[in-house]
Amino acid sequence: MTVKNDIVLWDNGREKLCLLTVPNEHQYKYIEGISCITFGISYENMNFKGCDTFTLFDHFYSNIVNEIESTYTSLNGSFRIYDVGADTDGYIELVMTNGKLSVKGQLGASFSSHSLMFEFEADQTLVGNLLQEITF
């Protein structure tokens, strides 16, 4: 399963973070009946652009959805989305304090020749958009 549509999670005119659909042939296949979602995350600014694919399944999926819901509801908290595989060490980490959001991440594997690290500030709307799109 993947997200329904490509969507912009955040765009302040300088930086843009998007959630992307993943073609069926590139989605991770897990055990029938167990929660599993595969999606892409892309980041771009005036000079760089990068993307990576993440798969959340089983208790990793349930835990991250609970962490996102808690952070969004309280406007405080943090969570880290990462792929649980040996093929990448990409991640996106979100820390919210009183509705102000700090986002940092790495798209692509640090051990490959191409990866992109980024960091920017946003607000709680990014977390709400993310939660809405990955919850099924």
Q: What are these model-derived regions, one by one?
A:
Residues I31-T73:
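Short, well-structured hydrophobic secondary-structure segments
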Residues R14, N45-K49, D87, F111-S113:
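Glycine-centered tight beta-turn/hairpin loop motif at sheet-sheet or coil-to-beta transitions
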Residues Y43-N47, D58, N98, L107-F111, ...:
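Beta-strand elements of well-folded, non-transmembrane domains
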Residues N5, N12-V22, K29:
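N-terminal intrinsically disordered, cationic/polar leader segments
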Residues C18-V22, K49-F57, G105, H114-A122:
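Short amphipathic beta-strand/extended segments with alternating polar/hydrophobic composition
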Residues L107-F136:
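Mixed-charge, glycine-accented linear interaction segment located at domain edges/termini
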Residues I31-T38, T88-A109:
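Intrinsic, low-complexity N-terminal interaction/targeting segments
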Residues T73-T97:
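DNA polymerase processivity clamps
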